[in-house]
From Swiss-Prot:
Belongs to the methyltransferase superfamily. RsmH family. This is Ribosomal RNA small subunit methyltransferase H. The keyword Transmembrane does not apply. Its EC number is 2.1.1.199. SUPFAM superfamilies: Putative methyltransferase TM0872, insert domain, S-adenosyl-L-methionine-dependent methyltransferases. Specifically methylates the N4 position of cytidine in position 1402 (C1402) of 16S rRNA. It catalyses: cytidine(1402) in 16S rRNA + S-adenosyl-L-methionine = N(4)-methylcytidine(1402) in 16S rRNA + S-adenosyl-L-homocysteine + H(+). The lineage of its organism: Bacteria, Pseudomonadati, Thermodesulfobacteriota, Desulfuromonadia, Geobacterales. It is an enzyme of class 2 (transferase). Residues 289-313 are annotated as: Disordered. Keywords: Cytoplasm, Methyltransferase, rRNA processing, S-adenosyl-L-methionine, Transferase. GO terms for molecular function: rRNA (cytosine-N4-)-methyltransferase activity. The gene is rsmH. GO terms for cellular component: cytoplasm.
Length: 313
C-alpha cells in the first residue's frame, strides 16, 4: 500500500465545534489520512458510526488501515462529498448527527511528485484527486483556448497576471506540450515580472490552485456537499468546514448565512409569504484559525479557516 502522510489541521478546534456524541452517526466528507475521523470515532464509541468519503483511492486505503481497529463503526466510501446525498441514500442513511469537510489538499498529495499538485516537485501535470477519471491539468492546458485559460486562472486563482500567463501557455504549447509541473512552474515564474514576485509565495501558486480547482470541479463540489450536508443533519446536529483559500471560505460563509436567515420578504409586506425558516445557528461568528504552536509545527495550517453551524429544529 502507498504510504500516506497528512497532518490534521485544527484537530482540537474541530472536535470542540463538532462535539461528537456517543452513539451518533457522523460523516467525514474528506477522509484524507483519517486523523479527524480517528478523533471522532474515539468519541462516538462502539455504538456510533462514522462514514468516511474520499475520491483518492490511496487516501481511502491508508485511512481504512489506520481505522481498522474501530471495526464496523467505520465505513469507508470512495466518492466525492459533492455526491453526499446519493452516497448516503446508497448506504441507507437518512440523517446525520454531524458532518466535517476539510477542503485542503493533503500533505501526501502535495509531496508526491507523480500526483502533479506541487510546483516544487517535478512530475506529470495531473492534479486529479481520482486519477482513474476525468481530464488532467495537462489536458486542460492543451485543449483550452487562451480566453478559457485566462478565465480559469483569473477566477479560480485570483491571479492578476492571468491574461499574460494564458497567452504564454498557448504560445509555448504550439512548440512543445506542457506536461510536467516544473515546466509549468518555470513558465509562470518567467511570465510574471520578477519585481512582482512575493517573498513567501511561489509565483506559480495561484495558477496551480486555479488548475487544481478546475480539474476537480472543487467549488461546485463544495456547494453541493454543504447543501446536502445541511439537509441531512438532524436537529442539533453540527457541520464543520475547514477552508484554505478565500474562494472556498466565501462559499462556506455565504451558504451558512443563507441557511441561518429566516424570512426574506420585503419589509413592506404585511405578513410573510416566503415561509422561509432559519435552518442553522452559526457557531463561529468569525472563522477559527490555527494558533502559533500549530503553524510552527505545520506551516500549511496558516491559511486554514474553520466555520461551524448547528441545525435548528
Amino acid at each position: 500500500m502507498e504510504e500516506f502522510h497528512h497532518l490534521s489541521v485544527l484537530a482540537r478546534e474541530v472536535m470542540e465545534q463538532l462535539a461528537p456524541r456517543p452513539g451518533g452517526t457522523y460523516l467525514d466528507g474528506t477522509l484524507g489520512g483519517g486523523g479527524h475521523s480517528e478523533l471522532i470515532l474515539e468519541k462516538i464509541g462502539p455504538d456510533g458510526l462514522l462514514i468516511g468519503i474520499d475520491r483518492d483511492p490511496a487516501a481511502l486505503a491508508a485511512a481504512s488501515e489506520r481505522l481498522r481497529r474501530f471495526g464496523s463503526c467505520f465505513r469507508p466510501l470512495q466518492g466525492s462529498f459533492g455526491d453526499l446525498a446519493e452516497l448516503l441514500k446508497q448506504e441507507g442513511i437518512n440523517t446525520l448527527d454531524g458532518l466535517l469537510l476539510d477542503l485542503g489538499v493533503s500533505s501526501h498529495q502535495l509531496d508526491t511528485d507523480e500526483r502533479g499538485f506541487s510546483f516544487r516537485l517535478d512530475g506529470p501535470l495531473d492534479m486529479r484527486m481520482d486519477r482513474s477519471c476525468g481530464d488532467s491539468a495537462a489536458d486542460l492546458l492543451q485543449d483550452c483556448s487562451a480566453g478559457e485559460l485566462e478565465q480559469i486562472i483569473k477566477e479560480f486563482g485570483e491571479e492578476r497576471w492571468a491574461k499574460k500567463i494564458a497567452l504564454r501557455i498557448v504560445q509555448t504549447r504550439q512548440e512543445t506540450p506542457i506536461t510536467t509541473t516544473l515546466q509549468l512552474a518555470d513558465l509562470v515564474a518567467g511570465t510574471i515580472p520578477r519585481r512582482f514576485h512575493e517573498e513567501r509565495i511561489h509565483p506559480a501558486t495561484r495558477t496551480f490552485q486555479a488548475l487544481r480547482i478546475a480539474v476537480n470541479q472543487e467549488l461546485e463540489q463544495v456547494e453541493q456537499g454543504i447543501r446536502a450536508g445541511i439537509a441531512a443533519l438532524k436537529a442539533g446536529g453540527r457541520i464543520a468546514v475547514i477552508s484554505f483559500h478565500s474562494l472556498e471560505d466565501r462559499i462556506v460563509k455565504h451558504l451558512f448565512r443563507e441557511a441561518a436567515t429566516g424570512c426574506t420578504c420585503p419589509p413592506r409586506m404585511p405578513y410573510c409569504v416566503c415561509n422561509k425558516k432559519p435552518q442553522l445557528r452559526i457557531l463561529t461568528g468569525r472563522p477559527v484559525i490555527a494558533g502559533p504552536e500549530e503553524t510552527d509545527r505545520n506551516p500549511r495550517a496558516r491559511s486554514a479557516k474553520l466555520r461551524a453551524a448547528e441545525k435548528l429544529g
